[in-house]
Design a protein with these regions (language model features):
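Dinucleotide-binding/catalytic capping subdomain of oxidoreductase cores
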Residues: 1-5, 15-16, 56-57, 106, ...
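Conserved beta-strand-loop-beta-strand element in the redox core of flavoprotein oxidoreductases
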Residues: 4-23, 29
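Conserved active-site and cofactor/substrate-binding residues in soluble primary-metabolism enzymes
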Residues: 5-8, 24, 33-36, 40, ...
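FAD-site-proximal beta/loop scaffold in flavoenzymes
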Residues: 28-80, 103-106, 112
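Glycine-rich phosphate/pyrophosphate-binding beta-alpha loops
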Residues: 72-79, 162-170
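Mid-to-C-terminal Rossmann-like scaffold of FAD/NAD(P)H-dependent oxidoreductases
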Residues: 81-84, 88-156, 164, 186-188, ...
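Short cysteine clusters
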Residues: 138-140, 168, 173
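Alpha-helical interaction/regulatory segments in DNA maintenance proteins
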Residues: 170-183
Length: 211
């Protein structure tokens, strides 16, 4: 998909094909530009991150002692792989390493699918050239691509354009910035998600805090 076109609503899309660019009339368009694991909690706990995923050993243990990770945060591989990783992490956490090892072969089989998934969703280089100067880069704050492209880093972009300062706190545009400009992703800070003041106030009166 090269461009979505319309007034008030989507009317047609422009596609790049081996025979050239064509236009197709349509009412809806769904695009997928890769899958990005959510590693914020791991980052906050000081776990090592590599290739946008929490690194783990054979027993799903992270770089932090007594912290195990499984599933999406260690890299996308499908629900079956996530379930097996969770079982291995659970057994390892309670010291049942022998039972954990019995699942290693099953995990390896599902990892073959994960490798194919990664290959299928790996972004092609030409996608980095799709954005135009007027392309909306940060939808929360209506910041265009040209304004962000002039900055030298993620922090610089936030300070001068308000990119990533909206409701999602950069959960979408920060990853795009890392991909397009090779910027380092921002460090996670609590709260990880937008939180109501009412919820924060309730924490101080929680029964758990009163014990």
């Amino acid at each position: 998909v090269v461009e979505a076109i319309g007034q008030e609503r989507l009317e047609r899309v422009r596609l790049q094909t081996p025979k050239g660019i064509i236009e197709i009339e349509c009412d809806r368009l769904a695009c997928g530009f890769g899958l990005v694991p959510n590693t914020q909690l791991g980052q906050l706990m000081g776990c090592q991150i590599k290739d946008n995923a929490i690194t783990v050993d054979d027993y799903q243990c992270t770089s932090q002692p007594q912290v195990w990770a499984a599933g999406e945060c260690t890299g996308f591989g499908g629900s079956e792989l996530a379930m097996v990783e969770g079982s291995i992490a659970g057994y390892a956490a309670i010291g049942q390493n022998e039972k954990a090892r019995q699942l290693f072969a099953q995990r390896q089989r599902y990892r073959l699918f994960a490798h194919l998934l990664e290959k299928s969703f790996n972004l092609r280089a030409e996608l980095k050239t799709l954005a135009r100067p007027e392309t909306i880069f940060c939808r929360c704050e209506d910041v265009t691509f040209d304004k962000v492209a002039k900055r030298s880093s993620w922090i610089d972009a936030k300070l001068h354009t308000r990119c990533g300062m909206g409701a999602c706190q950069g959960s979408t545009c920060a990853t795009a910035a890392a991909c397009l400009f090779d910027w380092q992703l921002p460090n996670s800070r609590p709260p990880l998600l937008p939180t109501r003041v009412k919820s924060l106030m309730a924490m101080s009166t929680s029964p758990l805090n009163q014990k």
